[in-house]
Amino acid sequence: MISYDLDKMLYTIPADKHSTEEIREILGKHPEIKFVSLVGIDVGGHDTDEKIPVEEFLKDMDKFLTHGVQTDGSSVVLPKIAKLNNAKVDIIPDKTVNWFVDHNFNYPDPDTGLPVGTLRIPSSLVHNDSERVGSRVILRDAIRNFKDDLMELLR
């Protein structure tokens, strides 16, 4: 079994460390992180992601963090929202939550000896540049409705 120095590994990037300078510095200190993945969860609970090599992400980080990436929506389950003829879906990163690293312990990075990692960024799905869709929106709305209903009951 391969053993790794767990103290040298990156596990999360907290929400308060998402400036471009901080991200660049953190990823620069962790060359074992080879990919950045913007991950959205559809209403069926399936994750849809776009995996970007770190070098490409760093070159155009502002664009990726602001506008995300576009997918054709073919693998996204959005019943009664997206159809094959209008399935354009943008995956927009959420800078208000912690990001985490998914390590592949089967593939050590030859330079660091640490497992190759993918920075996974929770993201929203936006259909046709108009509305946020997917499980993150359902959860957000459920929390808001619960709070509103509870406050109404307490009044």
Feature-to-residue mapping (PLM):
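ATP/Mg2+-dependent ligation/transfer catalytic cores
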Residues: M1-R155
